[in-house]
Amino acid sequence: MSRLTLALDVMGGDIGPRITIPASLQALEKDPMLSLLLFGDSRQIQSELDKVSDKISSDVGERLAIRHASHVIDNNQSVTEALRHSKGTSMRLAIESVQRGEAQGCVSGGNTGALMGLAKVILQPLKGIQRPALVSILPTIDGNHSVMLDLGANIDCNAENLYQFALMGAIFAENQLNLVFPRVALLNIGVEAIKGYKSIREASEMIKQNTALNYIGFIEGNYLLNGIADVIVSDGFAGNVALKTLEGAAQNVIGLLKGHSRNNVLKPLFGRLMKILFRDSYQRLRSINPEQYNGASLIGLTSVVVKSHGGAGINAFSNAVKDAALQVRQQIPQKILDGLNK
């Protein structure tokens, strides 16, 4: 395991330092070769650190540094407004530290559009990549995992964009999931060749021509978690809707299994009974919880950038930091570039 430094936008997300600081400490405790630069309001950061100062070992304390940022990009700001007023914000300063080489990757739970825009401008896409994409690892019902992209970075995509997503997704899956010749599929409204937008059909033909890709054709939304494909490619609109639908469905069913009922007397008994009867199914559904696999990566850039869920808890944000560290150690950007040049 190699030493590395990550830059964290600790003001990003719905809660900010009350989540990101404990999560940062958790990540440092689990990874003795990791150092963190914490970008945000120094008073708030120090206040959160003071709350647990008696639990912070000298080793962990030596591997974190506070970098003050006087401003924060609001989640409700438009991309244009956020970029125009990004100077001095925790998100921008974190990304700039990666550009300067002070850190090898960045993690933020802040405004997704602003993070993508700043990363593209400051860190730059890899040579030949038209658009970076948001990618995440999803659990499948057979106990394995798959990769899905784009999850919201690019609402409108042409055939070339989708083709490049397939290339990047396959390389990402090979390294993150340790797969050989991962199966690639395009998300569509049907499996027939005539179905879907023209861009999807054209992308399908382009992917077929590349023998380096193990293309299996179209996949419909009801099979996303079935383990049929290792890499699922879509435009950002469809991908984002599909992901949130899966998460919401899983959370609702988990709530049912836990016994969420208006009857307070029967609720505990019902919850325990459902967990016993459907133990295996319950555990599989829990794996779809964003807390377990939090962190969508913006791939196609010269450096690692991970977007955490805005509502992520301590464990979830810590997992996003862990994922960013893994990608840096695996040299994902360089491997994508090498794969594109083959």
Swiss-Prot record:
HAMAP family recorded: PlsX
Name this polypeptide is given: Phosphate acyltransferase
Keywords per UniProt: Cytoplasm, Lipid biosynthesis, Lipid metabolism, Phospholipid biosynthesis, Phospholipid metabolism, Transferase
EC numbers for this chain: 2.3.1.274
Main location, first listed in the record: cytoplasm
Catalytic activity, as annotated: a fatty acyl-[ACP] + phosphate = an acyl phosphate + holo-[ACP]
Organism in which the protein naturally occurs: Actinobacillus succinogenes (strain ATCC 55618 / DSM 22257 / CCUG 43843 / 130Z)
Function statement: Catalyzes the reversible formation of acyl-phosphate (acyl-PO(4)) from acyl-[acyl-carrier-protein] (acyl-ACP). This enzyme utilizes acyl-ACP as fatty acyl donor, but not acyl-CoA.
GO BP terms, alphabetized: fatty acid biosynthetic process; phospholipid biosynthetic process
UniProt subunit comment: Homodimer. Probably interacts with PlsY.
Cross-referenced InterPro entries: FA_synthesis, Phospholipid_synth_PlsX-like
Family label: Belongs to the PlsX family.
Pathway(s) served: Lipid metabolism; phospholipid metabolism
Any one GO molecular function term: phosphate:acyl-[acyl carrier protein] acyltransferase activity
SUPFAM superfamilies: Isocitrate/Isopropylmalate dehydrogenase-like
Record flagged with keyword NAD: no
Gene Ontology cellular-component annotations: cytoplasm
Subcellular compartments: Cytoplasm
Primary gene name: plsX
